[in-house]
Amino acid sequence: MAVDQHYENFPVASFLVPPSMRPFVAAIYRFARHADDVADEGDASPDERIKTLDALGLDIRSLFRGERPLAPTVLGLSALRNANLPGVSEDLFHALLSAFRQDARTGRYETFDQLLDYCSRSADPVGRLMLALVGVQHPQALRHSDAICSALQLINFWQDAGLDASRGRVYVPLEDFAAHGVSVDRFPASPEHQALIRFQCERAEALMRSGVGLLTHLSGRFRLEIAFTIAGGLRILEKIAANDFDARIRPTLRWYDLPRLTYLATRAWLDARRLPL
């Protein structure tokens, strides 16, 4: 899932996050980072990676049963668990672990629906945990959060498409290669692949914009944080487009993007306010 790269663009623990939330956010991040490293880093076999992830799953179960877990990153979630916040459920952590297990054994996806299913477990649970921290559990807010988080995950894929391909992972659905009449071979080195990346980016942008209504359920610094998170994703898409959708070029956010990010964040808030209640 490339957690570090994900938060490089979309830092959920930034200074805009209310101070009372930061320890919980940091604990969630450390857990996700550790599990992501288990799935992706080092030279362990897929079976060994899955065995370690299964052990983390047992620790999560112990944590939510009031027992002391063994893994430090799971133990670090104790304060969050003990806060008894509505919406902080064991299932969300198991969903994350199921996505990491999939990372350990799967490098390609046949369909977009399969990719979205992966996003629903690799990204959406984090958004739902963040909403639980601010006491937002409205069903519509959760749906909007899922759209934003899945869009951010997709944007991260298209930002890193060239790097992932060099590691044997191609997140562009194979059905889309067929639909565009191009081969997965040599992806993304062929110019014919640029139209394919454009299609993926357009789809991710539409999904992101479908979730801006979340902002109407939030307030204060956290609303601003999420508005800038949305803006970060949209800005990466703009940079991919500026590179003519050449996935061999990895765009990043820089300090000089702040004015554009501010504009995009403001635009997201205005778009959200125009939505029917």
Predicted regions and their residues:
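Catalytic cores of Mg2+-dependent Asp-rich isoprenoid enzymes
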Residues: 1-152, 158-277
